[in-house]
Amino acid sequence: ETIQAWYRKRYQVELDTETEILSLQGSQEGLAHVALALCDEGDIVLIPAPSYPIFANGPKIAGAELYEMPMLKEYDYLIQFDAIPEEIAEKAKMMIISYPNNPTGATAPDSFYEELIQFAKAHDIIVIHDTAYSNLVFDGEEGKSFLYYAGAKDIGIEFNSFSKTYGM
């Protein structure tokens, strides 16, 4: 209930304590295990490049194939969904993203999340959002919860971590 209240206050997101909140030893554990739970041998997982190592390692352990989505400075380090080949998008099982991003520090605007949800729904892709750095932003930027956006709960899972924010 404490996490539920925190998400409501911080992100204006309503979560069900019975079906939408799970406490883990850490978000890294969750990121690794979600790939084991959802991916089969040969599934394609879309990951940002560069990215935190567990984004690749979890799916690799599950036997999935990786497709790297470049995060380029010219696009403010936002993934360009139209750059993902259609044949890859159609075969992809899961996409892992992280905003605010590690290692670039980039944040994503509302339009990015809306496009992400539309893209994932169109291609039946499960979105995994790592929002561990949502409270470590600068220059007036704001870390957001992917779950705030309409349709996100239908296609995605979000991992958060208090250890980054509170130095635990």
Residue ranges and their predicted role:
Residues 147-168:
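Active-site PLP attachment segment
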Residues 72-144:
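Active-site phosphate-binding strand-loop segment of PLP-dependent enzymes
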